[in-house]
Every structure is written in structure tokens, then in C-alpha cells.
């Protein structure tokens, strides 16, 4: 017959197709027989939806490894944290002796011009991302050495970027904990996309420091000022001698 096509095996391909159930059975047998998941209350309570940024930041803020750079009395307050009274291990702080294993630099104490290149070298050897805490007045502004010292650096932020300033002379251990908590919040809000934008650079650093000589502010003129001859208190008639009388007594 010219108008009909006969299959070689005697079956018509248009009418002898497998059923939908047969196709489903074949698919389940060949593509891995995995049943539909049953989402229960117990399973839903053990599932956490998060992002790669949150997971990475959680791991970093829970394991801050500080490099302790202590040069003065502020470091004694930080050394108290290592003891069992404050127990700074609960924040995941593990002090490291090598800058290549640390991601947090804690500068505590006065920084001099001679120690400035060594501090910058330690900071550059730390892997990214890295953070800096300036601890104490001498580290932040130079402290009591900022008025007349020719060797003290007026703020460590002139050498390396600082993420958190911790004022005090010296700061108490509780204040150090507060600084660590604030730093952990900063780490937890970071993102991979914003890391290049937030990358901090050195503000300025020059060797030699190019300091120029200025006139001294301490002239000693206040030693020649005459004092008033008044009693220290109404009940005690003890007069105050002026500078000239004190000089005469010393000469005699």
C-alpha cells in the first residue's frame, strides 16, 4: 500500500508509545531514585540561610590573632588581659609573635622616630585584611612627650592607618575589651566587593622626618615671677616667700 507506512517490527510508532507512568518509572530507575524531601519542623530549625560574606566575616571576627607591639606602660594593662581574671581567650584572641601570622596590630606606648621604620615594616609584613588599634594617649597623639620631645612621633596614624583609637593613660582592661568588641562589629559588616574600596593606604611617612628647629617654649621666665606674701590658710600664718628671698637663702 502506498499510503501507509509499516514499522519493521510490525508496531506503529504513533500508537504504541509508552505511557506517562512508564516514562516516570524509567526515569526514576535510571536518574537516581531519590524521593521527595519531607521538610519537618526539626529539619527547618537546623537550616541557616547565610551568605559567603557573613560566613567569612564570622570566621575572621571569631579568630583575631593580635601582634602585641608594646613600648611603654600601656602594655602592662594589656598584659593583665592574658590572666584568668579577664580571660581574653573567649574572644578568640591568640597572641602571635610573627607578623605573618597576625591580622591585628595593637600598638601600646610611645613610638619614637627610631622605632617608626620597624613598626611600618611589621605592619607591611601582616597579611590582608589587617587591622590596627592605637592604645593609649602616647600612641594616639604623643601624650606627655608631644610638647617638647624631639624623638616622639605625634600619633601612630602618621605611620600606619589606624582602625580604632583607644584613649587613656593607660586604658583599663575593660576599655580594651570594648575596643575589641567594636572592632568585631566592624569586621562583621565588611564585604568582598567593598574590600578594594576600603583598603587603607599609608597617610604619609618620610625618612628622615625633616623636623626643623624652633624656639623653645620653656624659657624659665615663670621662675622669676614674684609670689604674693599671703598665708596658706587663715588658720596658719605661714607666709609664702618669693623667688628672690629663696635665692638669697640658698646663697647664704
Swiss-Prot record:
Principal location class: membrane
Co-factor(s): [4Fe-4S] cluster
Protein name according to UniProt: NAD(P)H-quinone oxidoreductase subunit K
Subunit structure: NDH-1 can be composed of about 15 different subunits; different subcomplexes with different compositions have been identified which probably have different functions.
Classification via InterPro entries: NADH_UbQ_OxRdtase-like_20kDa, NADH_UQ_OxRdtase_20Kd_su
Source species of the chain: Prochlorococcus marinus (strain MIT 9211)
HAMAP family cross-referenced by the UniProt entry: NDH1_NuoB
Source organism superkingdom: Bacteria
Amino acid at each position: 500500500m502506498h499510503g501507509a507506512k509499516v514499522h519493521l517490527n510490525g508496531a506503529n510508532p504513533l500508537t504504541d508509545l509508552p505511557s506517562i507512568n512508564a516514562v516516570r518509572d524509567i526515569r526514576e530507575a535510571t536518574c537516581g531514585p531519590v524521593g521527595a524531601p519531607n521538610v519537618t519542623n526539626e529539619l527547618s530549625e537546623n537550616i541557616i540561610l547565610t551568605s559567603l560574606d557573613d560566613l567569612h566575616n564570622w570566621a575572621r571576627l571569631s579568630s583575631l590573632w593580635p601582634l602585641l607591639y608594646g613600648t611603654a606602660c600601656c602594655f602592662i594593662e594589656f598584659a593583665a588581659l592574658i590572666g584568668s581574671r579577664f580571660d581574653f581567650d573567649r574572644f578568640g584572641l591568640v597572641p602571635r609573635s610573627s607578623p605573618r601570622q597576625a591580622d591585628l596590630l595593637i600598638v601600646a606606648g610611645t613610638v619614637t622616630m627610631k622605632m617608626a621604620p620597624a613598626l611600618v615594616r611589621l605592619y607591611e609584613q601582616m597579611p590582608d585584611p589587617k587591622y590596627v588599634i592605637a592604645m593609649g594617649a602616647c600612641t594616639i597623639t604623643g601624650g606627655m612627650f608631644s610638647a617638647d620631645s624631639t624623638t616622639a612621633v605625634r600619633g601612630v596614624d602618621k605611620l600606619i592607618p589606624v582602625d580604632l583609637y583607644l584613649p587613656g593613660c593607660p586604658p583599663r582592661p575593660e576599655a580594651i575589651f570594648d575596643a575589641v568588641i567594636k572592632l568585631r562589629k566592624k569586621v562583621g559588616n565588611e564585604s568582598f566587593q567593598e574590600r578594594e574600596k576600603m583598603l587603607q593606604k599609608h597617610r604619609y611617612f618620610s625618612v628622615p622626618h625633616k623636623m626643623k628647629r624652633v624656639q623653645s617654649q620653656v624659657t624659665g621666665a615663670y621662675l622669676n615671677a614674684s609670689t604674693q606674701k599671703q598665708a596658706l590658710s587663715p588658720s596658719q600664718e605661714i607666709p609664702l616667700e618669693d623667688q628672690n628671698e629663696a635665692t638669697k637663702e640658698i646663697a647664704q
